[in-house]
Amino acid sequence: MKRKLSVFVSVIFLLVVAVFSLPQGCYAMAKNAEVQVEYLRHRIYARRFIDNYNIHVFQKAHEHAGLTFHRGITVTRPRGYTTEDNIRRDSDAVGLGPACMIRWERPISGKLYGDLEFSGSFLIYSKAFPAQGRPWGFMWRLGPRLTWKYTKNNSFSLGYMFSHSSNGMRTNNPGHHSFGFSIGFNHNF
């Protein structure tokens, strides 16, 4: 267990060093902020009843060939329970971690745009989550979004997201799926 923890801490340290050693131009060019708030309800897994309340804050980092690449942070508050082995176990926690998103956007008409988003977050939880899991994990999201650009610098969006959360390990990996609506606001400076 100590070896796994030391490897985990080493990987996090190397990621932080890599991010902060980037040339300033790489992370100083973003001139916008996007906030997404969502409620995702549990689905698919029969023994995992966990709902997610998420806040994502993104900045556009790069644009290429119709795709935009974003970096940000995710705060999540999953709540619920699991019933593995017919034993009810509470699965409430708070998670925080870095996120990245890829968005493909196409105009529909006038100020209305259609988007397809894929994002991933690496989260550190306040305790082992879900029950019998680990205190860290990943959250993957995919879904369509409609964006209304009501001014040159502001837009409002509504999306429907599918989310998969797990820690990616073969053992102690009680992952769960959820679906739900996401509301977003973007402001360009």
Residue ranges, per PLM feature:
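Short glycine/proline- and aromatic-enriched beta-strand/turn motifs that initiate or cap beta-hairpins
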Residues: S21-V75, S182-F189
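Predominantly the C-terminal beta-signal and adjacent terminal strand-loop region
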Residues: N32, R145-F189
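Membrane-embedded beta-strand positions of outer-membrane beta-barrel proteins
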Residues: A33-Y39, F69-I73, C100, L116-G120, ...
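Flexible, solvent-exposed coil segments and beta strand-coil junctions
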Residues: N32-Y39, R79-T83, G120-S126, M161-S166
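Residues that define the transmembrane beta-barrel architecture of outer-membrane proteins
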Residues: K31, R47-Y53, D92-P98, R134-W140, ...
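Gram-negative (and chloroplast) outer-membrane scaffold detector with strong preference
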Residues: D51-A128, N186
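Extracellular loop and loop/strand-boundary signature of outer-membrane beta-barrel proteins
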Residues: H42-R43, E84-D90, S126-Q132, N167-N172
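Cleavable N-terminal export/targeting peptides
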Residues: M1-A30
